[in-house]
Regions:
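Solvent-exposed, non-transmembrane loop/terminal regulatory segments of multi-pass membrane proteins
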Residues: 26-71, 171-182, 415, 434-476, ...
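Hydrophobic transmembrane alpha-helices and their membrane-interface caps
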Residues: 272-319, 670-716
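Juxtamembrane segments of multi-pass membrane proteins
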Residues: 416-540
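Transmembrane alpha-helices and their membrane-interface boundaries in multi-pass membrane transporters
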Residues: 293, 309-325, 341-356, 360-399, ...
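Alpha-helical transmembrane helix bundles of large polytopic membrane transport and channel proteins
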Residues: 25, 81-191, 499-581
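Pore- and gate-forming transmembrane helices of large, multi-pass membrane proteins
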Residues: 277, 327-357, 725-756
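Extracytoplasmic
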Residues: 148-265, 269, 555-658
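Signature of alpha-helical transmembrane segments and their immediate interfacial
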Residues: 1-34, 385-440
């Protein structure tokens, strides 16, 4: 080696080290997320946009459901009051509700001062003689009820009961039971609280801090026997991040230990072990950096998927360290690098389609795979030859592994017909059985069933069970959204009267549009007119008109009052409810994005659900109104997700075929390379189907990995068939050992992934571990011919020390 060449090689290693240091630093600066919004479409429908806004930044994403269980009624109520007080004073929450009236006084006063602008009963008829008489009679009838205690002090100022009607309009259709002054469950011994976290739903650190604060405050005040329950979107997101992080760490640790053990057994050298790990480290770092820079954040599932590079990227290091022993670095680059390069290109062709997916999560997986594999291959090509010019410095059990592989190569072709028949039978089975591709968006989430059950229980207790259907109304401005919500409300009132709906909640019930408030204000008569009508309406009744001067004064004051605006409710409990129903454009949305009003619907008791077609017909003509069926929309998102992934996987497969055809330039060779890959995919699919596994997007990604890994094996065996010499002489022990070692590391790493508690990661492992093993065995059976014996009839040697034929 010349001095100039040596300097160039040292410089290459120096550049690699600098790049790895930069990548490691960038990884520490990357943002890691765990919410499912990364797996939602980038070009959603209007209905899907509503759901996505709630998942990302909506008020729904900031809701924290709190339960206090154990103890007796008094203990739970006291704990609820003390916890609510502590949380309100912490500054971490916009609002905390537990059924107490604390904080309602200011809001109530503001509403009372504009009750005639807000009450749905106020119109021109309300202040006629007949309207006044009916209103007063209704109010007097309530004096003997439990509500009379609150009505009586207001009687002379509000004889028509607009305060009562306003309260009825603003209360949700269903509400939790109140006991000892706080909300409680109807079914279990539990006090209930609802908090709105100040941190954005996408701010998982802020959400985690708020949850930790709740736990700390509860621990400080809880009496004996009391336990805390937390749920809500933020709880799920924080727990999912922790689960994914824990699984990634566990899998990375277990995978590293397994790889270390396998490589030490194979190489018998710590130095070789360290060298084999370099492509893996480069691949993982490059993948994280590429996704972080390209997507702005790295999803936890993408990071978990990155641990699979341990299984594939280490193959490159093994190929070089083992195969370079008899050839040296220059010989390895000449003989074996073209095959490794072609295998890399086929992998990139398969994953390139994913990188252009309309789903950010799927695009992340594609980008991570491409970047990681390229970095691992380039590290093998340019760095390992400098650090280990003669390959692995150790021997270990490589020769025994190579001998065992050689024996397998002789025996497997005898099973070719049986394996072909098995593959055909598997294909027929897949054609006859119902499609196993039935995954759901929830299948990507690591939230356990127990946590989902607790969430459903808390929501049911609060009277906020998950709505199956809602109405979303888009409008260019907040005012227009309220006006359209009022129009929709008038249509829904008809359905309530017909028994089609039990009720609905609308932002316009809490904050009527300015136009509606001004119309009600215009219906208020002047003092003289009102006094005359009151005298007639109260004649012969229990309320003398002479005592209703406060009522007349209030009406006159409100004739001059400005309409109530959203800003007037800031800091009150009503603000949180309004924020959940009247949504501004998303912060990341383009200019001109619409406001959205959400109207939740309650189906009549005992019914299976709402008739969406009838709802759409009723709302026909209300601009921007859409009926959103939540579960069908989620199913549609995932179905589109899966359908797009299938098309992209198909395009990737076509790209692989085209690349191989261009390189091999032989239909026969192309067929024998593709046959074991196709058979491995079919057998894996049939096996998972027979086991009752519901297949989803991540299984599809796993199949791409099977093709990516298996193509290396198929191409190697294809080169054994290039000429007669390959048929008469078995490949050398080191080459065979490198194949077996690469396969073992892949199967072990993906086998560990199959044990993950995160379903999405487990899906990849369940697919690739058996698929990689099958790809090796089927390649050996379908491609490797039986070695021809010498003419004297003696059998050929199983293994030899001469290198295999170079690829062309």
């Amino acid at each position: 080696m010349t001095a100039g060449a040596a300097r160039h090689r040292v410089a290459a290693v120096g550049v690699w080290l600098a790049l790895m240091a930069l990548a490691a630093w960038l990884c520490t600066r990357a943002t890691y997320v765990a919410d499912l919004s990364a797996f939602l479409p980038s070009a959603p429908t209007a209905e899907q946009r509503v759901l996505m806004a709630q998942l990302k930044n909506g008020a729904t994403a900031r809701v924290l459901l709190i339960g206090v269980r154990g103890g007796d009624v008094a203990a739970r109520a006291e704990a609820s009051r003390r916890l609510a007080e502590a949380l309100r004073g912490s500054g971490a929450f916009d609002a905390v509700h537990n059924g107490e009236s604390i904080g309602d006084e200011a809001a109530g006063q503001r509403l009372f001062e504009r009750r005639y602008l807000l009450s749905p009963a106020v119109d021109a008829r309300r202040f006629t003689v007949e309207g006044l008489r009916e209103g007063i009679a209704d109010t007097l009838s309530l004096l003997g009820t439990p509500a009379g205690v609150r009505i009586k002090p207001l009687l002379w100022r509000d004889p028509t009961g607009e305060t009562v009607r306003l309260a009825e309009a603003m209360l949700p259709t269903s509400a939790p039971r109140v006991e000892d002054g706080v909300w409680v469950s109807r079914h279990v011994p539990r006090a209930l609280l609802v908090a709105s976290v100040r941190a954005d739903g996408a701010d998982l650190d802020g959400q985690a801090a708020a949850q930790a604060l709740v736990r700390a405050r509860f621990a400080a005040l809880a009496g004996p026997g009391l336990t805390l329950e937390l749920s809500g979107p933020g709880v799920f997101a924080v727990a999912s991040r922790a689960t994914i992080q824990g699984e990634v760490e566990r899998l990375a640790t277990a995978g590293t230990v397994a790889m270390v053990a396998l490589l030490l057994v194979a190489f018998g050298s710590v130095v070789a072990l360290g060298l084999a790990a370099l492509p893996v480290a480069a691949g993982v770092l490059a993948g994280i950096v590429a996704v972080s820079l390209g997507a702005g954040s790295v999803h936890g599932l993408t990071l978990g998927f990155g641990t699979t590079l341990i299984g594939e990227a280490v193959d490159y290091g093994i190929y070089y360290l083992v195969q370079a022993r008899p050839l040296g670095a220059v010989g390895w680059r000449r003989v074996h690098w073209p095959t490794v390069r072609l295998g890399l290109l086929t992998s990139l062709a398969g994953f390139a389609a994913l990188a252009f997916s309309g789903f950010a999560g799927l695009a992340q997986l594609g980008l991570f795979s491409i970047s990681g594999l390229v970095a691992a291959a380039l590290t093998t090509r340019f760095v390992l030859p400098v650090l280990a010019p003669q390959g692995s410095p150790g021997l270990g059990l490589r020769q025994r592994l190579g001998a065992a592989t050689g024996t397998l190569l002789v025996r497997l072709p005898r099973w070719r017909r049986a394996l072909t028949a098995l593959s055909v039978a598997a294909l027929a089975l897949l054609a006859l059985l119902p499609s196993p591709w039935r995954g759901t968006l929830a299948s990507l989430s690591p939230v356990p069933a127990a946590a989902l059950a607790l969430d459903a229980s808390l929501r049911e207790d609060l009277g906020a069970a998950e709505a199956g259907t809602l109405v979303a109304i888009e409008a260019p401005t907040e005012t227009a959204a309220l006006e359209r919500a009022e129009q929709a409300g008038a249509r829904l009132d008809t359905l309530v009267g017909q028994g089609v709906l039990q009720g609905y909640d609308s932002p316009a019930q809490r904050l009527p549009s300015p136009a509606t408030q001004l119309a009600r204000r215009a219906a208020l008569p002047d003092a003289a007119t009102l006094a005359a009508r009151l005298a007639e309406a109260t004649a012969g009744g229990p309320l003398p008109a002479a005592r209703l001067d406060p009522f007349i004064a209030d009406v006159q004051a409100q004739r001059q009052a400005a309409p109530l605006m959203r800003a007037d409710l800031r800091g009150t409990p009503l603000a949180a409810a309004l924020d959940a129903q009247l949504l501004p454009p998303d912060r990341d949305a383009a200019a001109g994005a619409p406001w959205t009003a959400l109207l939740s619907l309650q189906a009549p008791a005992g019914t299976a659900g709402l008739d969406a077609a009838r709802l759409r017909a009723a709302l026909d003509g209300v601009a921007g109104a859409r009926v959103v069926q939540i579960q069908p929309e989620l199913d549609a998102i995932y179905a589109h997700y899966l359908d797009q992934a299938r098309w992209q996987a198909g395009l990737g497969a076509l790209a692989v075929v085209a690349l191989l055809a261009l390189h091999l330039r032989s239909a026969r060779r192309l067929g024998r390379v593709l046959a074991p890959l196709a058979a491995a995919v079919v057998l894996v699919l049939a096996g998972l189907t027979l086991l009752g596994v519901t297949l989803g997007v991540l299984h599809l990604v796993g199949l791409l990995l099977v093709v990516a890994v298996g193509s290396n094996y198929a191409l190697f065996f294809d080169h054994l068939c290039l000429d007669d010499a390959a048929r008469d002489t078995a490949p050398d022990t080191d080459t065979l050992a490198s194949l077996l070692m690469a396969n073992l590391t892949t199967v072990v790493s993906f086998g560990l992934l199959a044990t993950a508690e995160v379903p999405a990661l487990a899906a990849v492992g369940q697919t690739v571990a058996p698929g990689a093993l099958l790809a090796l065995l089927l390649s050996a059976a379908f491609i490797t011919p039986r070695p021809a014996g010498p003419r004297d009839g003696t059998p050929p040697p199983l293994v030899g020390e001469s290198p295999g034929s170079p690829p062309k």
